């Protein structure tokens, strides 16, 4: 399962995350902001990856940095606790999923980021 996700095109997965948030009344910009915050990419670099032939796994492997607050991003995604995932790459991917879930539940990107920045 992991390798299949890692090999998927970044654009396909990322656009699905955006669609999930937009279906619930959220905005694509919120997804861009939380992705940028988590991975260290500038928003413009995240958007540029949509037009490049980059895999989802490579997007995360090549992230400029991960914020220290990411360890505070815990909980379940697809029935699995993020903090119990052994594969560090999959952990980072699932952390973004968790942030996107908050956005899909009606939180703004500012509310989501403030929640985790309190753990500095």
Enumerate the predicted regions with their spans:
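A charge-rich, low-complexity, intrinsically flexible signal that marks solvent-exposed coils, linkers
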Residues: 1-120
């Amino acid at each position: 399962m992991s390798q299949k996700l890692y090999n998927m095109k970044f654009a396909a997965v990322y656009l699905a995350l955006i669609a999930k948030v937009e279906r619930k009344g959220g905005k694509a910009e919120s997804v861009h902001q939380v992705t940028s915050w988590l991975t260290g990419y500038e928003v413009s670099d995240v958007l540029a990856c949509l037009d490049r032939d980059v895999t989802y796994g490579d997007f995360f492997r090549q992230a400029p940095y991960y914020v220290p607050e990411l360890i505070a991003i815990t909980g379940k995604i697809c029935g699995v606790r993020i903090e119990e995932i052994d594969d560090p790459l999959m952990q980072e991917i699932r952390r973004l999923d968790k942030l996107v879930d908050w956005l899909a539940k009606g939180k703004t990107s500012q509310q989501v980021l403030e929640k985790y920045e309190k753990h500095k």
